[in-house]
Regions:
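Loop-to-helix entry and N-terminal half of a specific, functionally important transmembrane alpha helix
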Residues: 15-22, 124, 192, 341-370, ...
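Transmembrane alpha-helices of multi-pass inner-membrane enzymes
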Residues: 40-47, 214-215, 355-365, 373-416
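Membrane-interface helix-loop-helix junctions at transmembrane boundaries of multi-pass membrane enzymes
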Residues: 4-13, 48-63, 175-189, 225-237, ...
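A membrane-periplasm/extracellular boundary helix in multi-pass inner-membrane enzymes
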Residues: 221-270, 284-291, 414-415
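Long extracytoplasmic/lumenal interhelical loops at the membrane interface
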Residues: 141, 145-147, 268-324, 341-345
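Alpha-helical transmembrane segments of multi-pass inner-membrane proteins
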Residues: 2, 43-44, 73, 114-146, ...
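N-terminal signal-anchor transmembrane segment
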Residues: 1-53, 69-79, 364-366, 381
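Aromatic-anchored transmembrane helix interface
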Residues: 60-72, 82-105, 115-124, 167
Length: 416
């Protein structure tokens, strides 16, 4: 046993490092299959072979996501051409398995949460810097990190790049407001890079997601901590951060190229949103059409019938996964938000990570009304974090109940 124990500890460290590296790779998706898919496919497969445990708490996530993808498989029967459909559902199933994987390894050890968020933050800073440098054409060939004069970092789409940066930005905001002041300059610098990357993505969804989730985070922190000194610190640092970001925005807007694109993108409703067969018209027609198609129409078919894809996660669930998939996805999302909300204010070592993940899930569900988040890798990571933390809470309560019984059994004396 003495020999086996160090070996087990070494294997756990290697496993945790492999997970952190996988999360880091999620920030670099220029082409598909991306390095993230290749790495995580091997990692998830190996971990399952070695005996990954799925507890009763995380089993509903597995059941709902598998049912969601069964709906996708049924929708394939409605397609005339199966050229791209099966691969799309295969990717969906793989992403579902990554979510289960993250939930299970977090339940196994909450110490993996800092590794996950630090790796995510590191990847976010690097990909954000690539987007910023590309936007300003800092070196030859840097335009590969932009699309339509919008920063996209090491992603294919600015609308995915921007939201990817938001959860690590929230993590940094929490670290600035509640962490050690010695690390404040480093965290503030990293946050500024992420904020600039989000801004230069010119994604209205990312802008709204960042602004609203930061406000929700600050509100919940003020609600949880009742210390007057802590609340004063949060308010002062929040005010300082707002002033710094506002000043950075003013400086960025002095660049004519930035100012022009900002003026165009800052409009709440663009021409392609409100015109005939625009975004909102397609939503209306699509929902009406899906009321008559219980099995959906198949992956990527909607874009061949209309000028663009669904750009709505609820409509996407109906078209690509049918009624079964839609009910499963909505049920999974509601369950995720309920679990997180119920445990979010408890004083636990994993509470900050749960809070950031829950707020991010809520924000992504909201922007899902105007954008498709179906194949966003980081969204499945967020699902896994919330469910993993919920499983940690169940295990914590079970342990707390058993300890008094053990003490009572050892120390109690009965008289006849």
């Amino acid at each position: 046993v003495r020999v086996a124990q160090p070996q087990r500890l070494t294997l756990r460290l290697i496993g945790s490092a492999a997970v952190a590296f996988g999360v880091f790779l999620s920030g670099f998706v220029i082409d598909e299959p991306a390095p993230y898919e290749l790495w995580m496919a091997g990692l998830v497969g190996l971990w399952f072979i070695l005996g990954l445990k799925i507890s009763r708490t995380t089993a509903p996530l597995l059941a709902l996501l598998l049912t969601f993808n069964i709906g996708g498989m049924l929708s394939l029967t409605q397609m005339r051409d199966l050229a791209t459909g099966p691969m799309y559902i295969a990717v969906s199933t793989f992403l579902a398995l990554t979510s289960i994987f993250y939930a299970a390894i977090i339940e196994d050890s909450h110490k993996r949460l800092p590794l996950i968020f630090n790796a995510w933050s590191f990847a976010a800073v690097i990909t954000s810097m690539l987007g910023i440098l590309g936007y300003f054409h800092a070196f030859p060939g840097s335009e590969v990190f932009t699309l339509y004069d919008r920063a996209k970092g090491a992603f294919q789409d600015p609308n995915v790049f921007g939201p990817f940066l938001v959860p690590p930005a929230l993590y940094l905001v929490h670290g600035i407001l509640a962490g050690n002041l010695r690390t404040l300059p480093i965290k503030a610098g990293a946050l500024l890079i992420l904020a600039l990357g989000i801004f230069l993505s010119f994604s209205r969804a990312a802008w709204g997601l960042f602004a609203v989730t930061v406000l929700i985070l600050i509100f919940i922190m003020l609600l949880k901590e009742r210390s007057g000194a802590f609340r004063l610190r949060v308010l002062i640092l929040s005010l300082g951060a707002i002033i710094l970001m506002a000043a950075s925005l003013v400086v960025a807007l002095q660049v004519p190229k930035v100012s022009e694109l900002f003026s165009a993108r800052a409009q709440l409703v663009q021409q392609y949103d409100g015109e005939h067969l625009g975004r909102f018209d397609r939503h209306r027609i699509g929902f009406q059409m899906m009321m008559e198609r219980p099995l959906g129409i198949g992956p990527l078919v909607f874009g061949t019938m209309f000028p663009e894809d669904e750009h709505n996660i609820w409509l996407k669930s109906l078209t690509t996964y049918g009624w079964l998939g839609f009910v499963s996805y909505v049920g999974m999302l509601c369950w995720t938000l309920t679990l997180g909300f119920r445990n979010m204010l408890l004083d636990r070592p994993w509470q900050p990570f749960l809070m950031v993940a829950w707020i991010s899930v809520l924000g992504h569900a909201t922007i899902g009304n105007v954008i498709d988040i179906d194949h966003w890798r980081h969204v499945y990571l967020l699902f896994g974090i919330v469910w993993g933390c919920a499983a940690l809470e169940v295990r914590h309560r079970r342990s707390a109940r058993s300890q008094p019984l053990e003490k009572f059994g050892k120390g109690a004396k009965f008289r006849a």
